[in-house]
Regions:
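Periplasmic-binding protein-like
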Residues: 143, 204-206, 213-214, 247-272
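A ligand-binding cleft/hinge motif common to bilobed small-molecule-binding domains
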Residues: 98-102, 231-250, 300
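Extracytoplasmic ligand-binding site segments that recognize negatively charged/polar headgroups
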Residues: 88-228
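N-terminal secretory signal peptides and thylakoid transit peptides that target proteins
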Residues: 1-19
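Early extracytoplasmic/lumenal segment of secretory-pathway proteins
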Residues: 31-101
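N-terminal Sec signal peptide cleavage junction
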Residues: 22-23
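Extracellular/periplasmic bilobal clamshell ligand-binding domains
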Residues: 313-351
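Mature extracytoplasmic/periplasmic domains
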Residues: 271-328
Length: 351
């Protein structure tokens, strides 16, 4: 289950999600149609996708925005390209660094077009979030992977080594890095801390101390809510959802190991085979506008990518940023990330 899908259900919103590769939105009788590929939880009632569709169409009445949704992320389009099948979309929204690396390594020609310098507003994106050296992907938000913990049950662990102490035995839930974004980010964070030569030894120690590796974020967070453990790998925006008089805030404390959080920016990119490349770039520019950035942050529960945007409200009050953000760059991951994950899966998950 995707994090945003789970959270929308948990707070009582109507899901209204499309099926795999389904299209949302009906083209008008005239004008242009922009087809945006995105993960399914980007669309539906109350989502960033539906707000963007409505607002963009209001400003561009001759344009219809449709969503092509996928549970398999960019992998579906990598497969289409490798098989010579049509992409049938103009723009992909929701791309992260590892997915871009995968697309570039598996395909002879780029799946995406270079368009970053032609996107109005791209110069306002926080420099630290840029992750495509070829200028194809423009970040539109970011999250920070952290721990969420129950302060009534455990003290905040200060460092990665603290997690190995006896008082944290059987207390940490995480996700499988083979298929989960936060799980992969947490694994990469441990590699960043322990090095490519030391991370597997560290994970062996975590395993000995009872870490539980579950399939995805939703499964892990449900287990945390069921009090199967006192800590879970999650996002530093946890309290945006979980606060108020009817919430035990002690169970939604955010912990930054080593005073850090792992930055996991999301980006958008125009497909190289886009039927409407100029319209795709206009939509990308619209997503970087101050109003859109505030709406995306609030509805995705992620931080804005653009400098100086304050979403305000509950987000402004309860979203926590780490003292230091760490992440791996595109160049760091090329030729490495696949092997790191494969070795981890073979030695840790399979045992």
């Amino acid at each position: 289950m995707n994090r945003r899908t789970f959270l929308r259900h948990s707070v009582g919103s109507v899901a209204g999600l499309a099926a795999l590769s389904g299209c949302i939105g009906t083209p008008g009788d005239s004008g242009q149609t922009l087809t945006v590929a995105a993960y399914s939880s980007f669309t539906g009632d109350g989502t960033a996708g539906n707000w963007l569709k409505s607002a963009f169409e209001s400003e561009n009445p001759e344009t219809t925005v449709t969503f092509q949704t996928t549970e398999n992320g960019v992998n579906e389009f990598i497969q289409r390209r490798s098989q010579g099948a049509p992409i049938d979309a103009d723009l992909f929204v929701g791309l992260n660094t590892g997915e871009l690396v995968r697309a570039d390594q598996q395909l002879d020609d780029s799946l995406f077009a270079a368009s970053g310098d032609r996107i109005d507003g791209s110069e306002t994106v926080k420099t630290a979030l840029d992750f495509d050296p070829a200028g194809r992907v423009v970040p539109y938000d970011t999250g920070y992977i952290s721990l969420v913990y129950d302060a009534e049950e455990v003290d905040e662990p200060a460092t990665f080594d603290t997690l190995l102490k006896p008082q944290y035995e059987n207390e940490l839930l995480t996700q499988n890095a083979e298929g989960s974004d936060p799980g992969r980010a947490f694994l990469l964070w441990t590699i960043n801390q322990k090095g490519p030569d030391g991370y597997l030894d560290y994970w062996n120690q975590l395993t000995d101390n009872g870490i539980q590796i579950l399939s995805d974020w939703g499964t892990a967070y449900e287990a945390y809510q069921d009090e199967e453990a006192s800590m879970v790998v999650s996002y530093s925006t946890d309290q945006v959802y979980y606060h108020g008089d009817d919430v035990d805030i002690s169970r939604h404390q955010v912990g930054f190991l080593n005073d850090q959080g792992y930055a996991n920016p999301e980006g958008m990119a125009q497909f190289a085979d886009a039927d409407n490349p100029e319209l795709a770039r206009e939509f990308m520019s619209f997503m970087l506008s101050e109003k859109a950035q505030a709406e995306i942050a609030t509805r995705n529960v992620q931080f804005p990518a653009v400098e100086g945007v304050d979403p305000g409200g509950d987000f402004g009050e309860f979203a926590l940023e780490p003292p230091e953000a760490v992440t791996y760059s595109y160049d760091d991951l090329v030729g490495n990330v696949g092997g790191w994950i494969d070795d981890w899966a073979r030695q840790i998950v399979s045992n």
